[in-house]
């Protein structure tokens, strides 16, 4: 059996976060519908985004994410990662709302991971053990996007990939 190396805890967590942000009406997916693509654009984007995407998101709140640290513990089956989410908006109220939601959703460590696991939204090839808020930055003018404010939320996650009998990813 060949492992699917495209599965990544960070992108699986993104699926869950997007669903929750929609469910709590923090984001309206209709505001992110692209006529050019004929589909909804998920405004939680990897750090390398195209100029076209910046133009599409002009003036719209969105989140950019990246992996900022990864290591395995003494138990080599458990991975520990830090994921940086940078929230952008022209309105400080939007940033506060998203930051407060993420704090509430992910501060509960094992229970936060359980919610993600049981959501049915993430791959069954990853098991989340713990998710918590490791750091939150204050809101400030964005250095990357003129006219936007930004704030960072760093989540630390512990998880494992489901393994075969030899300890390799399934």
List each model region and its residues.
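Short, charged interaction patches at domain edges and termini
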Residues: 1-23, 68-78, 122-170
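Short connector loops at helix/strand junctions that flank enzyme active sites
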Residues: 58-60, 78-82, 150
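Generic detector of low-complexity/intrinsically disordered segments
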Residues: 39, 47, 59, 120-123, ...
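Active-site-adjacent structural patch at catalytic or cofactor/ligand-binding sites
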Residues: 66-68, 78-90
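Extracellular/virion structural assembly segments
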Residues: 76-79, 90-116
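Short glycine-rich, low-complexity/disordered patches
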Residues: 25-39, 112-132
